[in-house]
């Protein structure tokens, strides 16, 4: 996914109220939209280099959106995508390119399909002989050990519910896949069980029930973000 226009560089002053950040740019200090509800551990250090996209919508109160941060992570500095609204589009793009091996044989992705009393699945993949597949996408940008991506970075009750709902899909004879989009360089994925033991339990139970899980690292840079390759999920049973 290429950014539509060159990103605006800046330096992070502070992130606050979860969805707001103050950024110093060449044109002065601005308040921007921070499209991330998580803790952003290791990604919100004051003074960090950031890159912002500009909306063409004149009605937007905050025309700039925080997209990337150059974070000092274990293993060295790297660009990290912090926009949690991007992963679904990244998965759709990779699906069209045939880069999601777990969805080989499917020919269509329908977004936002209701499948449980209080849940919507991100995509319903169809067209395969094996039948439709419920696809849930999770954004990941936590790294506390070099090369190891983790999720979640805060309590994730909603994500735990998604795992339970997907396990029920499989129990009812359906198919389900969780795609973890890692918006940074990483070599493997694991659950941050110390941050949210309840999600860890739901994740393990869903896998044991037959929910497939695949993790993909992204190539991230000022020009764009794209799914690059699958990485192993090392969470034990």
Curated annotation (Swiss-Prot):
Pfam families: SfsA, SfsA_N. Signal peptide: none annotated. It comes from the Bacteria. InterPro entries: SfsA (IPR005224), SfsA_C (IPR040452), SfsA_N (IPR041465). GO terms for molecular function: DNA binding. PANTHER family: SUGAR FERMENTATION STIMULATION PROTEIN A. NCBIfam families: sfsA (TIGR00230). Belongs to the SfsA family. This is Sugar fermentation stimulation protein homolog. The lineage of its organism: Bacteria, Pseudomonadati, Pseudomonadota, Alphaproteobacteria, Hyphomicrobiales.
